[in-house]
Regions:
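Bacterial Sec-dependent N-terminal signal peptides
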Residues: 1-29
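Phosphate/dinucleotide-binding and metal-coordinating scaffold of catalytic cores
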Residues: 24-351
Length: 351
């Protein structure tokens, strides 16, 4: 589906040019060396062509096996770059709901090394889910939510907006073009911030980094997202920075957030809210925790956060207005510290 809108975006990451760099020896990739994701990062949209057995992916969303494919990076005036890849459906809820599931793309380490890149072999691709303008807007809103967390902290998943043409290898399905976005590899995130992934290790939850936890929970409240759980590590990655003992929570998957408001999103039945547009604060900790420094950070970054959607030309104007009003209610609350402290209690808060 081709969009008639302009593509100009005003986001924080600068264009990173392709460069050949020799791979160093060692167990971890060289941090001075660019990754595939580094080379994809730019202010404008990355154009891709994915050719694979689309019929197999769409009909068998629960398939855990990779299928063969080719991914072409469209470089405009220069030569296109084509990679042989493996691709499979991924996700949980979206894999069941979407007509076109999210995808996991795996590159050959040999190909990456041959092109002067380090060894982060997999990337997640968030897809359009279903046909139609409404679902395109949902995807763009979720992308914007990731960018908002990037503004607040570098300890976050980077994302890259793409315009991707899907081609069926067997020519059984007509080619189609949609927006999507790629999510940074989790090991790359850990290496970038000098941390270690701690998956399936709940023993560390009692000593979670207090500053980052306040930021994490207040951000989830800002976007109205309750679809996360620390103890189950649901939609959260835990990382421990070098020489520290307190893990950092890093969120992902925001389609159930009120700010995104996906048509299929509903809150858990155990929560005292009727729809995802209602905020509920899920901070678990000392009732007397002082959030003022966290409020100050959000206020300092407010202009950048708001510009991410107001200056985003691919979002429809009614969507921008709705997002502005939703975020304004949050900022109005945190700027009334006494009221905010009463609402943001240990037992949750509504707004």
């Amino acid at each position: 589906m081709q969009s008639k809108k302009e593509y100009s975006l005003f986001f924080i990451f600068g264009t990173i040019l392709f460069a050949g760099i020799v791979l160093t020896q060692g167990n971890k990739p060289d941090l001075d060396q660019q990754s595939l994701f580094d080379q994809l990062q730019k202010e404008s949209i990355t154009e891709l062509i994915l050719k694979t057995n689309l019929e197999q992916i769409i009909a068998n969303a629960n398939d855990v096996d990779y299928g063969d494919g080719k991914l072409t990076f469209v470089n405009g005036d220069t030569s296109n770059v084509v990679y042989d890849i493996k691709v499979k459906p991924r996700g949980v809820t979206r894999k069941q709901i979407c007509d076109f599931p999210p995808l996991k793309i795996k590159f050959s380490k040999t190909d990456l090394e041959a092109n002067g890149m380090d060894g982060y072999k997999t990337l997640k691709l968030v897809t359009h889910c279903k046909e139609g303008e409404d679902f395109e807007q949902v995807l763009l809103k979720e992308y914007t939510a990731y960018k908002m967390y990037n503004v607040l902290t570098e300890k976050s998943f980077r994302v890259q907006l793409v315009k991707i043409t899907y081609e069926d290898a067997n020519q059984e399905i007509e080619p189609s073009t949609h927006y999507g976005f790629l999510i940074e590899n989790k090991q790359e995130l850990a290496d970038r911030i000098g941390a270690e992934l701690k998956e399936k290790d709940n023993s560390i939850l009692t000593q979670i980094d207090a500053n980052q936890y306040r930021l994490f929970t207040l951000f989830q409240y800002m976007i109205g997202n309750t679809d996360w759980n620390l103890s189950k590590q649901h939609n959260v990655k835990l990382l421990i920075e070098n020489e520290k003992i307190s893990p950092l929570p890093v969120p992902y998957d925001f389609d159930f957030a009120g700010l995104v408001n996906a048509p299929y999103a509903t809150p858990y039945s155990t929560l005292p809210i009727e729809n995802v547009k209602q905020r509920f604060f899920q901070f678990k900790g000392n009732r007397n925790t002082d959030f003022r420094s966290t409020y100050d950070l959000f206020n300092a970054k407010k202009a950048e956060i708001m510009c991410l959607h107001t200056d985003f030309n691919l979002l429809d104007e009614p969507v921008k207005i709705e997002m502005t009003n939703y975020l304004k209610a949050f900022f109005d609350l945190i700027n009334e510290h006494q009221v905010a402290d009463e609402k943001l209690s240990l037992n949750g808060a509504y707004l």
